[in-house]
């Protein structure tokens, strides 16, 4: 049975009323348009659905706005939140004038990275396994006006609520600052919420593993299994969608901001990755930590291009409030076996099939398709140019003396990341995976955000400087 036939079987089986077409913008935000089921026939899968691309930031100008959503029938899944029976289908964005994939479509770029890897003869499969963390609050308020800039959040788990009056009483069980890793209830108040999120993800076909409380108060993580690059990008988009909507249904609010809370750990998205060829893992060998030489070159490519990668893996100004010393954030560009203070870690596994590299500096504000594709391209460049990462750093990098620390390269800041991407993008442009036009438009988009941040007076500036 064809994938398109399966879509129509799902429509019939669930008495579907709407087909929700979903696509991802350059920032990583999921968008949708709902088609009444009567408009969906086999021709739609051939011709696609037209939409206005000028309304999406970083895409078309208004005088060339027409674009096509090309449905991917393999992604069809029932939506768990819609009141009317709704079938979700993820889409790629195409150029109507050429009938080819749009060069700025993130999902298309991820597909192009997989295709380039195979055409280069290095590997035929790239696996990615992200570990995305998030915060859940009971309430959040923020305001940005000429005369007022503020934010305020509240969570019953927060250490700042220890003396707060609650209608049913303040029961006192809550994690302290940096004290939230793996406690049982009642200190962990989010277990049922996370279990619901994980169950909904499983219903949507996302392969799930576990859930647990994270280090910070009100911080959580769901574990999903690794998959191929594009498929994992799809799974991450549904991960965020489910987390936001289940939290909303519980009367709470979830955020994937890397650093919403000052003074506690931020949220990362560690990315486990490996490449295979003809069913064989390419990262297992007899070098350091039982890695292959090819795996070391892959790590070398990531470390060499890390500052350009930061523009995709840590794309927001808030990202760099997480990447500071003192909060378990991997700011040092080094690699090590099992050592979580290094930005590239090689987890211990007994099986060669499980041999992988964990890149620890990315965060969940990243567009998953672009971040995964950029990491793969950096790793492939390392392999092609035999870029060795140097000696491993097996000591605790957080405790290095100042003179040793100064010799270890670090991740960068928001502006430096964009400048680095501008100067170091040739590895991304191989095979036209990331086109020059796409990179320039992405830099422009993120520069707008950076300028908005840099030119806005901050409340702490009033505290420090008002009386100068």
From Swiss-Prot:
The record's remark on the cofactor is:
Binds 2 Mg(2+) ions per subunit.
Q: What class of enzyme is it?
A: ligase
Binding positions (Mg(2+) 1): 131, 270, 358
Show the GO cellular component annotation of the record: cytoplasm; membrane
What this protein needs as a cofactor is:
Mg(2+)
List ligand-binding residues for L-glutamate: 265-266, 322, 328, 340, 360
Is Magnesium among the key words of this record?
yes
* Transmembrane region(s): none
Q: Which reaction does it catalyse?
A: L-glutamate + NH4(+) + ATP = L-glutamine + ADP + phosphate + H(+)
Instruction: Name any one GO molecular function.
Output: metal ion binding
- Report the domain of life of the source organism: Bacteria
**Magnesium in keyword set:** yes
* Occurrences of domain GS catalytic (ranges): 106-468
A Pfam family of the record is Gln-synt_N
| The protein's Enzyme Commission number | 6.3.1.2
Keyword set, alphabetical order? ATP-binding, Cytoplasm, Ligase, Magnesium, Metal-binding, Nitrogen fixation, Nucleotide-binding, Phosphoprotein
Q: What does this protein do?
A: Catalyzes the ATP-dependent biosynthesis of glutamine from glutamate and ammonia.
What is the name attached to this protein's record?
Answer: Glutamine synthetase
Q: Which organism's genome codes for this protein? A: Azospirillum brasilense
What is the name of the gene encoding this protein?
glnA
